[in-house]
């Protein structure tokens, strides 16, 4: 297992990495602005489960295949980016749903947020490449590397989930403030959708 010094180095490095805005954070903020705090938090949960699925792949050695294969990397990247763009388009098309739901005192549903978050988290190839390059550096070569990789990935995912949840709550609070004038939610939902479209486009273009 990693030594105490390796754990400290890992926790510090993970904290610094997590503070840099990435696809998961931008997706979470976009969801919070579009569908609200509760849905965004459930999306964070789903995203974390998707990331954990990637950790399992990396621990099993399959992550290295995706990282090394240009075709596999491109397929996963395009699938994930296309899905995020589709979510953004749907948010813009249905931008009045939040206002209408508020007027009707009932929530709108367009897919379970946990499932949506899982899909986004599991189809981000950048995370796989990151885990392949990052996690083994803190594993003890003399121990069970696969088990250590899974443990490190679990800790990283938990830290990222806490950070994303804080951002979701903050963005959800901003949305609640906008909701004092329900008509503003149309613009806010469209803004969140635009953020997700921009995120998806970035995922497509960045190598």
Task: Give residue ranges: language-model regions.
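Hydrophobic residues within the alpha-helical transmembrane core of Major Facilitator Superfamily
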Residues: 15-16, 49, 85, 118, ...
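Juxtamembrane transmembrane-helix termini in multi-pass membrane transport proteins
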Residues: 2-74, 133-152, 156-157, 168, ...
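Hydrophobic alpha-helical transmembrane segments in multi-pass integral membrane proteins
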Residues: 55-59, 123-128, 195-207
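Selective transmembrane alpha-helices of multi-pass membrane proteins
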Residues: 67-99, 157, 163-167, 175-207
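Residue-level hotspots within pore-lining transmembrane alpha-helices
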Residues: 16, 20, 53, 119-126, ...
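Juxtamembrane cytosolic amphipathic helices that cap and anchor the N-termini
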Residues: 5, 108-112, 125
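Cytosolic-biased juxtamembrane loops and peripheral soluble domains of multi-pass membrane proteins
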Residues: 91-120, 179
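Select subsegments of transmembrane alpha-helices in polytopic membrane proteins
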Residues: 48-53, 114-127, 189-192
């Amino acid at each position: 297992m990693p030594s105490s010094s390796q754990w400290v180095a890992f926790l510090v490095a993970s904290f610094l990495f997590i503070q840099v805005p990435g696809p998961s954070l931008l997706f979470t903020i976009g969801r919070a602005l579009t569908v609200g705090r509760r849905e965004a938090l459930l999306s964070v949960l789903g995203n974390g489960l998707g990331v954990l699925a990637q950790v399992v792949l990396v621990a099993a050695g399959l992550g290295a295949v995706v990282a090394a294969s240009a075709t596999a990397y491109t397929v996963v990247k395009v699938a994930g980016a296309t899905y995020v763009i589709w979510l953004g388009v749907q948010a813009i098309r249905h931008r009045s749903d939040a206002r209408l739901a508020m007027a009707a005192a009932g929530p709108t549903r367009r897919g379970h947020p946990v499932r949506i978050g899982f899909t986004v988290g599991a189809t981000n190839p950048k995370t796989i490449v990151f885990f392949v390059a990052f996690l083994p550096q803190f594993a003890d070569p003399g121990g069970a590397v696969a088990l250590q990789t899974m443990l490190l990935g679990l800790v990283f995912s938990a830290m990222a989930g806490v950070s994303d949840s804080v951002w979701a709550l903050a963005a959800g609070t901003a949305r609640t403030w906008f909701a004092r004038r329900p008509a503003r939610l149309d613009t806010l939902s469209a803004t969140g959708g635009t953020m997700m479209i921009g995120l998806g486009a970035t995922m497509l273009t960045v190598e």
